Amino acid sequence: MQSIILFIPALIANSGAVITGGHFIIDRGKKFIDGRRILGNGKTLSGYAGGIAIGTVTGFIIYLISTLFNYALGTYGTLAEAIIIPFIMATGSLTGDIAGSFVKRRIGIDRGGKGGLLDQWPFALMAFLFLYIFERPFFMYHYFYVTMIVILVIVPPIHRAVNIIGYKMHKKDVPW
């Protein structure tokens, strides 16, 4: 359970991107060699930076709460790691989301189109990959095998629920 709580910054980063997004489209309207948009209007620098910031702050808040409750929620380690590790997870998460959008455009799924696991897993997988590359001891301790699989199983229903909430708040055009 602690490892799932410590993964929250990767999950929150995507919601943070929706809330802070809308400015400075990453692909600037350009098309890939296949004639389709590289990413689409939904991927913006303001969302990328804002999502990373919100994910990082969320991780720091988890650190503060866990310290207050004597590490009952788990810990990232030191104060510096409480900033660095959530930053890595949030950056990986949003990079994975962008990669998923790139793949969706290549296979002909437009912005807002249902992508199934392409909407749900790339952000989690890339967050894991970034942790493995940049914070391997933390990754190996918290996310090796079973916990990683559990997170990949719970991500789709959580992702769906959050998207429905975003849709009802008029932050998303579609509820998926």
Curated annotation (Swiss-Prot):
Major site of localization recorded for this protein: membrane
InterPro entries to which the protein is assigned, alphabetical: CarS, CarS_archaea
One Gene Ontology MF term: CDP-2,3-bis-(O-geranylgeranyl)-sn-glycerol synthase activity
Catalytic activity: 2,3-bis-O-(geranylgeranyl)-sn-glycerol 1-phosphate + CTP + H(+) = CDP-2,3-bis-O-(geranylgeranyl)-sn-glycerol + diphosphate
Cofactor dependency: Mg(2+)
E.C. number: 2.7.7.67
Ranges annotated as spanning the membrane: 4-24, 49-69, 83-103, 115-135, 138-158
Alphabetical keyword list: Cell membrane, Lipid biosynthesis, Lipid metabolism, Magnesium, Membrane, Phospholipid biosynthesis, Phospholipid metabolism, Transferase, Transmembrane, Transmembrane helix
Top-level taxonomic group: Archaea
Subcellular location: Cell membrane
UniProt-listed GO biological process terms: glycerophospholipid biosynthetic process
Topological relation to the membrane, as annotated: Multi-pass membrane protein
Pathway stated in the Swiss-Prot or TrEMBL entry: Membrane lipid metabolism; glycerophospholipid metabolism
Function comment: Catalyzes the formation of CDP-2,3-bis-(O-geranylgeranyl)-sn-glycerol (CDP-archaeol) from 2,3-bis-(O-geranylgeranyl)-sn-glycerol 1-phosphate (DGGGP) and CTP. This reaction is the third ether-bond-formation step in the biosynthesis of archaeal membrane lipids.
Family: Belongs to the CDP-archaeol synthase family.
Name of this chain's protein: CDP-archaeol synthase
Species assigned in the record: Thermoplasma acidophilum (strain ATCC 25905 / DSM 1728 / JCM 9062 / NBRC 15155 / AMRC-C165)
Record gene name: carS
